[in-house]
Amino acid sequence: MDDVRTVGTGPHRVLGLHGWFGSSQGWGQLPDYVDRSACTWAFPDLRGYGGRRDEAGEHTVAEVARDTLAVADRLGWDRFSLVGHSMGAKYAQQVLVDAPDRVRALVSISGVPAGAVPLDEQGRSLFTGAADERANRYAIIDMTTGNRLPAAFVDGLVQHSLDVSDVEAFRDYFHAFCDEDIAAAVAPVADRVPVLVVAGAHDAALGPDAAKATWLQIYPNAELVVLAEAGHYPMYETPALLVAAVEEFLARV
């Protein structure tokens, strides 16, 4: 499956859903550090990204969830844990809604919450312009990593997003993760699985305070881990610490 990157051969099966600027190949060093004997990880491309860049789609929350379950079926996975980065965490929640009996655990890394994301006019303009403007993509990544990292680091993430994503799909996914509200659908299944919420202290958009106001309000049993030296992209900024936190959690569920 060219659109799914797999790592490891362990018994605990994990599906990783990438973020807006990511792809199946855009997980930083996380795949390098995972315990390959404990878990089998699968990182699919969303429609419009990577191996599916030219595949048409609606680019909605519901569609991503359907596609994710289809990937699990292709892999022969009846049960699995979900790890979602950024917008991928919102889509992972819809998978939980659609198939709660198949989800073993849920991990949010800098995750977009279930509800709609409130943005002021300036913020919305910045994000909606990112589909067409490289400078907007740079500004978003720089801001969400604390305006503290080398320009080459930020520009590398920008270039990856430009290389792997279709512009129209990228544009559509903003509306999916920002405007769609699935909180009411999530509420009835919020206590069905263990949940880990990982937030970077330098993430100006979805940091610890945002996580406490959203994820921890919806999921009564959620655990919060704050990575003190990370922003929105801990798989690039502090990958070893991220993997340690995620694997400690997955080993318990």
Which residues does each predicted region cover?
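Conserved HGGG/HGGXW glycine-rich cap/lid loop of the alpha/beta-hydrolase fold
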Residues: 6-54
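Conserved loop-alpha-helix segment in the C-terminal half of the alpha/beta-hydrolase fold
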Residues: 196-230, 236
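Short beta-to-alpha linker loops that shape the active-site pocket of alpha/beta-hydrolase fold enzymes
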Residues: 45-50, 112, 230-231
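Active-site loop/oxyanion-hole signature of alpha/beta-hydrolase fold enzymes
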Residues: 31, 40-83, 87, 244
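Alpha/beta-hydrolase fold catalytic core
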Residues: 1-15, 33-40, 77-78, 146, ...
